[in-house]
Design a protein with these regions (language model features):
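Short beta-strand-to-loop transition segments that serve as allosteric relay/switch motifs
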Residues: 130-140
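Regulatory sensory and allosteric helical modules in signal-transduction proteins
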Residues: 48, 53-56, 65-99
Length: 159
């Protein structure tokens, strides 16, 4: 199925996510819709708190407890989520198990996941959180997928 990322029409999956956010169904349900749309195995939603740190609002099943404990609060500029917020740009890793860019923290490897992308959740020009998805296999997310995630992030920001 081709997705039109143009601003003139809204893809059906964005409308479904927008309805879920507007209905207050919760970040966990929104994350589930995102994972299905991106054919991803895992994901997280972090939002900036009053303390300036990113706070975990939703996480998919299967993330080890030790990792959840580590990512419950993330400093801006640390790890893929913190870097996406700091840079206001997607952070993409084909395989977090073998990545040598410095963008992937050692704790991320404990998930056993490989392909991963995290985008900033933007409210206007401000990054207010991070939306990340990952797969159990090597995968470089496309620019179109990154743009879709950024659009979803803008919907989350309105929630």
């Amino acid at each position: 199925m081709q997705i039109d990322h143009g601003r003139r029409s809204r893809p059906i999956d964005l409308i479904e996510i927008e309805r879920s956010v507007a209905a207050g169904h919760g970040w966990q349900e929104v994350l589930g819709l995102v994972l299905v749309r991106l054919n991803a195995d895992s994901g997280t939603i972090h939002l900036l708190g009053d303390d300036g740190a990113l706070h975990l609002k939703a996480a998919s099943a299967g993330i080890p407890q030790v990792v959840l404990d580590t990512v419950r609060v993330v400093a801006v500029g640390k790890g893929m989520a913190g870097l996406a917020v700091e840079r206001k740009q997607p952070v993409n890793a084909c395989n977090i198990q073998t990545d040598t860019s410095g963008d992937v923290r050692p704790g991320a490897r404990a998930t056993g996941l490989q392909g991963s992308v995290v985008v900033p959740i933007m409210c206007g020009d401000d990054a207010i959180g991070a939306l990340g998805v990952a797969t159990r296999y090597e995968r470089t997310f496309t620019v179109a997928e990154e743009e879709l995630l950024i659009d979803i992030g803008r919907i989350i920001a309105r929630g």
